[in-house]
Amino acid sequence: MKAFTKITAIVAPLDRSNVDTDAIIPKQFLKSIKRSGFGPNAFDEWRYLDHGEPGMDNSKRPLNPDFSLNQPRYQGAQILLTRKNFGCGSSREHAPWALDDYGFRAVIAPSFADIFFNNCYKNGLLPIVLTEERVDRLFKEVEANEGYQLSIDLAEQTLTTPSGETFTFDITEHRKHCLLNGLDEIGLTLQHADEIHAFEEKRRQSQPWLFNG
């Protein structure tokens, strides 16, 4: 998992509430358990004018010019700004995979669906909860200023605007530790590999019948 420390990046606005996981990555693309390759189909039904299916050459598909993420000014964005209850619907882990593969490192919203929120942390994506008032202000600033960037410092738990205004966000110490060090659940387990191996060797000696066959 990629570590998250600090970024300064373009913000892309998605001015919609209750964006569900089927909108983030439609069900027809959930045929792989690899974490990569989902970016070209993120927001597929909004992003393209035709109906997408696995195996299509996305570079030849007609883009929807009215979809905000297709606008040239938001290309290369690594921060997604959106509205309340983002990531609702099914619990598919492909949703944060698709956002990560698209290039997003952080998502800012007034609220997130619980399962999606937890899945973000497991996949190196930082979900930031801000008040609706602050999110409203950010939408206005992003839309009024082309190339608008925010700076996120995870260690300090701060978000800084181009004008220098800084505000904080909440995150548990455990989740912050994992993101700062690029540790998913497997990585956390492997930190204790020596202890696990010692335990197994001790058990092999005391209960050898468990290891026969």
Swiss-Prot record:
User: What GO annotations for molecular function exist for this entry?
Assistant: 3-isopropylmalate dehydratase activity
Q: Could you tell me the EC number(s) of this protein?
A: 4.2.1.33
Q: Which GO terms describe its biological process?
A: L-leucine biosynthetic process
* Pathway the protein contributes to: Amino-acid biosynthesis; L-leucine biosynthesis; L-leucine from 3-methyl-2-oxobutanoate: step 2/4
Note whether Lyase occurs among the keywords.
Answer: yes
**Gene3D superfamilies (alphabetical):** Aconitase, domain 4
Q: Does the keyword Lyase apply?
A: yes
Q: Name one GO cellular component term.
A: 3-isopropylmalate dehydratase complex
Give UniProt keywords alphabetically: Amino-acid biosynthesis, Branched-chain amino acid biosynthesis, Leucine biosynthesis, Lyase
In terms of Pfam families, this protein maps to: Aconitase_C
Catalytic activity entry: (2R,3S)-3-isopropylmalate = (2S)-2-isopropylmalate
Domain of life assignment: Bacteria
Annotated PANTHER family: 3-ISOPROPYLMALATE DEHYDRATASE SMALL SUBUNIT, 3-ISOPROPYLMALATE DEHYDRATASE SMALL SUBUNIT 2-RELATED-RELATED
Q: How does it assemble?
A: Heterodimer of LeuC and LeuD.
Q: Which family does it belong to?
A: Belongs to the LeuD family. LeuD type 1 subfamily.
What protein is this chain from? 3-isopropylmalate dehydratase small subunit
Which organism was this protein described from? Neisseria meningitidis serogroup B (strain ATCC BAA-335 / MC58)
Q: Which gene encodes it?
A: leuD
